[in-house]
Amino acid sequence: KEGHLTACYSDTKGNDNYNNVTKPAFAGSTMKPLSVYGLAIEDGTICWSSLYEDSAYGVVAGDNGIAREWPENVVPFTGKNVTAADALKESNNAVAVKVLKDYGVEKSVRFLEDTLGYDVDNEKKILEEEGEDRTLSNIASGYLAEGEDRILSNIALGYLENGVTVSKMADAYQVFINEGKDTPLCAVKEIEKSGETYWTPQQKESEVFSEDTAYIMNRMLREVVTDGTGISAQVTGLDVCGKTGTSEYGDHWFVGMIPGNVCAVWYKSDKDMDAETADAARICKGVFEKIGADASEQYSIPTGVKEEVYCKKSGLLAGEQCQETGIGYYKEGTFSKLCEECR
C-alpha cells in the first residue's frame, strides 16, 4: 500500500539474470480497469450500471478473407444489455472496447504513458498513421477502419505492443486500495549506519484517480472475485478484489488486492501444466493466505460515494415497480431521477 515491495519470485530458467518480474508481457484483461473502466468512471462517461449491448463492436476480415465479428468473447454474445460492472466481472471484451471508444482512445493512451509510465510508443504511431476519427460509424459496411481493431485491442484488451511488466501492474493496482494514490515501488525501506538512519527512499505520492473512483473500481473488482472470472482467488474472511487476464499468446494473469497488499501473478502457459497449478487467481489466493492479513480490516466508503439499488432493465435508480435490481456504488449526484421504464 505504501509502495513497499515485500517479495518477488521468478523462475530463472538457469540464468541468474533472468527475471520475469521485470520482463514485459501482454497484460490481457488486467489492463481493462486501468485503460478503460477507471478512466471512464473518473470523468463520468460511465457509472456502475451504465448499459451496453452484449454484441460485437464491428466486423473484420479474417485470415481466410471471411468476415467475422470482432472482438471475440469467451462466451457467445447474447444481444442483451449488460451493466458496466457485470461486463468487467465477466471480462466482456466487446463492452470494454465500446466503453473505450466512448471515453476516447487517445486520452487513454496519454494516461497510460504520462500517468502510469507505460511504453505506448507503437500505439501513438498507430494513432498518428490511422487517426482516431476513423471509426466504425463512418463505414457503411460495418467493417472496422484499417488499423482500428489493432489500436482498440492494444488499449482495451491489453495488447500493448511493448508489453507491461509484473512490477508495473502491481504498482498500478495499488491505487485501487490506496484512495486513488500511487507511491513508487521500493524494495528497501531504509539503510542504517552506526544505529542511525542513513538513507530512506524519496517516494513522491501522486494522485492517479479520485478517492471516489478508486473505491468504485475496488468494489467492481470485488465482484470479479465473488462472482466472476476470479472466483478461485476467494479467501475466507478476506476482502479480496482483483482481475484476471489472458492473451492469445499464452499469457495468464491475476492481479489481486486485499487491504494493504497487492499481488500480481503472471505466467506463460505450458501444455504440461496442471490446470489447478496454473490458475493465476489460485496462486494469488495462496499468497494472501500466507500473508495472514487482518480479516477485520475493511475499505472505508468515501463520503462522495453512495450505495444504491439500481434497476437492471434501465440502469437507473430502482423504483418500487422495478422487479430486477442490483446494488451498485455511485458518485454522489450520478442520478437525477428514478427508473421510468418499469412503470
Residue ranges and their predicted role:
Residues L5-K23, A27, P33, G163-D171, ...:
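A penicillin-recognizing enzyme superfamily signal
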Residues I46-S108, L136-S137, L152-I155, S194-E223:
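Conserved catalytic neighborhood of penicillin-recognizing serine enzymes
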Residues D43-C47, Y103, K107, L112-V120, ...:
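A generic secondary-structure signal for well-formed alpha-helical elements
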Residues K1-T6, L116-G117:
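Short, glycine-anchored, charge-dense loop/turn motifs used at functional sites
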Residues S49-S50, V120-R134, N138, G147-R150, ...:
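Surface-exposed patches in mature extracellular/periplasmic domains of secreted proteins
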Residues L5-T6, A27-I41, W48, V95-A96, ...:
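Extended, hydrophobic alpha-helical segments in both membrane/secreted and soluble proteins
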Residues G65-V74, G104-D171:
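Mid-domain, small-residue-enriched loop/turn segments at the edges of structured enzyme/sensor domains
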Residues N17-T22, G79-N81, K89-A96, E128-G158, ...:
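Flexible glycine/proline-enriched surface loops and loop-helix/loop-strand junctions
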